[in-house]
A protein has these predicted regions:
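Catalytic Zn2+-binding segment of zinc metalloproteases
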Residues: 40-56
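Hydrophobic, aromatic-rich membrane-embedded alpha-helical segments
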Residues: 52-69
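Peri-catalytic and regulatory segments of divalent metal-dependent proteins
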Residues: 1-36, 40, 44-45
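Generic anion/oxyanion-binding catalytic loop in active/binding sites
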Residues: 21, 71, 134
Length: 169
């Protein structure tokens, strides 16, 4: 499959991670590490297990609208949690952001994406109809994922930390 995508599944061991061939073709080894660690986070935090419990409620007509909203809310948080674990494990916010961008917009567009493009994404994400659309999505908008990586990098990549000095003898 030429699309860049990956997913984890399994209710019990053995769990599985699927990488589409597009991911293997277009991502570097380090970018693949980000994607694999992200998917491992879904396994570690049992996100696939939660899906098994949510799905029966989504089939009940009266509950399905509210259930879809709750499910989308939970899935978006699960994606941010998996992104955060990839950041914490790999310790490189730029690598994590670059990987997410490449998977979301494709390898060619990712190379030319700059701050102006990111500002445009932020602007369009904040429009009322996009806010509404986001409430039923199972993945956060890319700009939200990138801003969360920026937020958490301060925890993972402390800047200007004074070096510990050994006490004088």
């Amino acid at each position: 499959n030429p699309v860049m995508n990956a997913y984890a599944f399994g209710f019990a061991r053995p769990y599985s991670i699927v990488l589409h061939s597009g991911s293997i073709r277009y991502l570097t080894k380090d970018e693949l590490k980000v994607i694999v660690v992200h998917e491992m986070a879904h396994i570690k935090y049992r996100h696939a297990n939660a899906n098994v419990y949510l799905m029966p409620f989504l089939s009940i007509p009266i509950i399905s609208v509210l259930g879809s909203w709750i499910s989308g809310f939970w899935h978006r948080r699960a994606e941010l949690t998996a992104d955060r674990l990839a950041l914490m494990y790999l310790g490189d916010s730029e690598l994590v952001k670059k990987s997410l961008i490449k998977v979301h917009v494709g390898p060619d567009a990712a190379d030319s994406m700059n701050e102006v493009a990111r500002q445009w994404m932020q602007y369009t994400a904040e429009r009322p109809m996009n806010h509404f659309a986001q409430t039923f999505s199972d993945h956060p908008f890319l700009v939200r994922r990138l801003s969360q990586i920026d937020y958490w990098k301060g925890v993972v990549e402390p800047q200007n930390q004074p070096q510990s000095v050994a006490p004088a003898a």
